[in-house]
Amino acid sequence: VTTPLLPPPITAVAAVDTTLRERGHGVLDPAGLHQCLGAPAHALDAWWGYWDRLAPDLHLRDGGHYRQRRHGGFIVDGARLTAAPHRAHWQPLEYNALHGGIERWFEPLEPGLVAEPLWPSLLLWLASRASALRGVQPWFIEAHPFRIDTAGGIGRPTPEGAHRDGVDLVAVMLVRRTGVKGGETRVFDADGPAGLRFTMSQPWTTLLLDDER
């Protein structure tokens, strides 16, 4: 018996900023994200190949080999997007008890991905959402393409468990699901028992989170 997936509550494009302010989170469906980027339907599917060429995550403290990723940083100042020098990813222990407190170096993003026409559109749009939430200012964006491989049994997208990232805004985008069971997303209030659970199943479904909440 297959348990049906619980779909996410979809946020209307016009209500994204209001929903983030009022609830601390919102979910765009694929059509909504493409609309926000001014792109035709399925345009982002051209990015799928980059997720076939991610590098092994060598920093998993649970001894696993199920996660591949790359990493890149960008600065958005107004309408200007600049690639930052490649650097380590670092989180304090208070936000990530398993992987915090160490410099984690990952392979950089492929130049081809950064050169994709919709790449700056996505990052500038996300920076605009952060400015709507916190006020207009320059933003530093870290991009983390992930791939979780379940071929060996169990893959853990977040082996550190429920945690905050210590940033202003988090965007979680589902690129694709292939041969995967589970993969449930859970959103928790930082200071209370309230929460939300659902499964993103359609490519380019996007969860936006006010990380402080």
Language model features with spans:
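Short, structured patches in soluble enzyme cores that scaffold and shape functional sites
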Residues: 145-147, 173-175, 189
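Short, hydrophobic/aromatic alpha-helical segments in well-folded domains
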Residues: 157-158, 170, 174, 203
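Conserved short histidine dyad/triad with adjacent acidic residue
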Residues: 145-164
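Catalytic core of Fe(II)/2-oxoglutarate
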Residues: 184-213
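A short secondary-structure junction signal
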Residues: 153-158, 181-187
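Short, conserved beta-strand element in jelly-roll/cupin
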Residues: 164-180
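Fe(II)/2-oxoglutarate oxygenase catalytic core
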Residues: 2-143, 151-154, 190-200
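Conserved hydrophobic/aromatic beta-strand scaffold that supports enzyme active sites
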Residues: 27, 145, 170-172, 206-208
